[in-house]
A protein has these predicted regions:
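C-terminal-most transmembrane helix of multi-pass membrane proteins
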Residues: 2-4, 45, 53, 57-61, ...
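Hydrophobic alpha-helical transmembrane segments of multi-pass membrane transport proteins
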Residues: 15-23, 27, 55, 101-123, ...
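Transmembrane alpha-helical segments that form core, pore/gating elements
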Residues: 38, 52, 139-141, 176-230, ...
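Hydrophobic transmembrane alpha-helices of multi-pass small-molecule transport proteins
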Residues: 52, 151-171, 191, 222, ...
Length: 316
């Protein structure tokens, strides 16, 4: 059987993504209390889209300059250049269509997932929300089977190990589950769909552009219930700007873009396992920044989750 290589560069990019997201749970907890869940998510996604606009223009300019230099050094005939130009035009239209479909699909998934998560965080702790969100490590490979995406025994073992960690953290008093936990569990399913949608589109389109479109779609869709249900006032933002800016610039603009780039040509189950480290980081961030209790049980869970990640990185 041919061994499956896991790109180290992609793994490190996704690890950085998980770190930013883990800290963002603190920002979501603080910001959501100040302005409302929908208002918080709408604002941070629109900020994320806005941040990526100059980045896209800069990358386009650099690519255009590089392409121009290549053309000037070439010696192709006029006939060949015309034929190439026609093919490029057709390909460009197809790429644009794929980009728009991918961006809108990701935006809808992100809108539903992030809003269920934000609402859930209002009724449960930052650390618990982080771990329940990480249930996508189980959902992704199961859904992937229907898409003919197979996983090695090492990866399945890592999923089981991570699931044990989630059980140790979340199920403390029997099998009862609170309102906030249920909302975040729905969010985990939706993030699983989001990961698989990215897995499908990321090799085909520009990751930064697709990320920008998804934020714009998510921000606009979330703004509708924010305006109708929460009636946001500018004065309410005064105590939440720090959290909103971190969530908008880092969690959205930087981290979600890194996710799209990092997931390119990567097994979605391995990607989900790396991203699930956000749960461990969210517990530590809640402990350090918010002063929330960090129990011995939660420390053990962090170790178990890290062991699952290491297991998933072994040569397949």
């Amino acid at each position: 059987m041919k061994k499956q290589k896991i790109p180290l560069k992609n793994s490190l990019i996704l690890l950085l993504t998980a770190t930013i997201w883990g800290i963002a749970f603190v920002a979501q907890s603080e910001g959501g209390d100040a302005v409302g869940a929908f208002t918080f998510n709408a604002t941070r996604n629109l900020i994320g889209a806005l941040i990526l606009v100059p980045v896209i223009f800069l990358l386009e300019r650099l690519n255009s300059k590089s392409s121009s230099d290549t053309d000037n050094s070439g010696t192709n005939s006029t006939k060949t250049n015309v034929s190439k130009s026609e093919n490029t035009s057709v390909s460009s239209k197809e790429d644009t269509r794929t980009l728009i479909i991918g961006g809108i699909s990701c935006g809808i998934c992100l809108c539903l997932a992030s809003n269920f998560q934000q609402l859930g965080i209002l009724y449960t702790s930052v650390g618990k929300a982080g771990f329940i969100t990480a249930c996508y490590i189980v959902i992704v490979p199961i859904m992937g089977l229907f898409m003919k995406k197979k996983c090695s025994p090492f990866i399945w073992a890592a999923v089981v190990l991570a699931l044990i960690g989630l059980y140790l953290l979340c199920i403390t008093d029997g099998f009862s589950i609170g309102k906030g936990d249920a909302l975040v569990l729905v969010c985990a399913f939706l993030f699983s769909v989001h990961i698989l949608v990215i897995d499908y589109f990321s090799p085909k389109v520009d990751g930064v552009k697709m990320s920008c479109i998804q934020f714009l779609v998510c921000g606009i869709l979330t703004a509708i219930p924010a305006i109708i249900l929460e009636h946001p006032l500018l004065s309410a933002f005064k105590g939440a700007w720090g959290a909103i800016l971190y969530a908008g610039i880092m969690s959205c603009g930087v981290a979600y873009t890194l996710q799209i780039v990092g997931q390119k040509n990567m097994n979605p189950t391995v990607a989900s396992l790396i991203l699930s480290l956000e749960s461990c980081i969210s517990v530590l961030a809640g402990w350090i920044i918010l002063g929330q209790n960090l129990t011995t049980r939660e420390i053990i869970v962090c170790v178990v989750m890290f062991a699952a990640l290491v297991l998933a990185q072994l040569p397949q």
